[in-house]
Amino acid sequence: MLLWLARILLWIPLSILHPTYIYGRKNRPKGKAILCSNHRSNWDIVLYLLHTKEKVVILAKKELTKNKFFGFILKHLGAVFIDREGNDINAIKECMKALKEGKKLYIFPEGTRLKDESKILGEIKSGLAMIAIKTKTPILTVWHERKPKAFRRSNIYIGKPYELTEFYG
């Protein structure tokens, strides 16, 4: 319900302010998948959700709950909040549970936004592979070409799914 309402309220202003095109929509599988995305700005997940009309579980940093409004929105969109200071086993278990239920998980494996636009990707944390292997889930790369700027088109590319089958036990 909340995602539907957000789409209605945000579609026109964001389509004008941040026109976005998504390439590779057909690469998305029907069932569970881990959407592994680079992280250019706070708009990344908003633009993806707005233009794909896809329901996903978002792995988000716990600090986002400090803003009551934003925390409320993310919680009701089904976000899993992770404490980046240590090994947050409960957040990892919640992500794995969502995947076992056939849901999609949207994750930023760098754990933070990449400020340097000349780089494609920052250092990736190890949790992504562990979650994919333990849940036998395909990984799709989602690449935000550049940081969104007002009235400049943004492109999002979705890669073909791949699995780490050689590591499945």
Q: PLM features: residue spans?
A:
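Membrane-anchoring hydrophobic helices of lipid-metabolizing enzymes
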Residues: 1-34, 43-47, 52, 78-79, ...
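A conditional alpha-helix N-cap/helix-loop micro-motif detector
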Residues: 85-89, 121
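Catalytic-site beta-strand/loop segments enriched in glycine and acidic/polar residues
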Residues: 98-128
